[in-house]
Amino acid sequence: MKKKISLSCSLCKNRNYKTNKSVQSRLQINKFCKICRKSTLHQEEK
C-alpha cells in the first residue's frame, strides 16, 4: 500500500510537493523550490 507524504525543502523548510511512496526508506529528491528559486534537496516529512 502506498503512503501519502509531503516533501519539504531542506533550505527554507517549505512543503512544496505531495506524493505517494511505496518504499520504507525516507525519500530525498532534488526538486525545484519556488520560494528559494533554485533546485534544492527535498526530504520527506511526516
Curated annotation (Swiss-Prot):
Protein name: Large ribosomal subunit protein bL33A
GO cellular component terms, semicolon-separated: cytoplasm; ribonucleoprotein complex; ribosome
Lineage: Bacteria, Bacillati, Mycoplasmatota, Mycoplasmoidales, Metamycoplasmataceae
Keywords from the named record: Ribonucleoprotein, Ribosomal protein
SUPFAM superfamilies tied to this protein: Zn-binding ribosomal proteins (SSF57829)
GO biological process, alphabetically ordered: translation
Native source organism of the sequence: Mesomycoplasma hyopneumoniae (strain 7448)
Family label: Belongs to the bacterial ribosomal protein bL33 family.
Pfam families per UniProt: Ribosomal_L33
GO molecular function annotation: structural constituent of ribosome
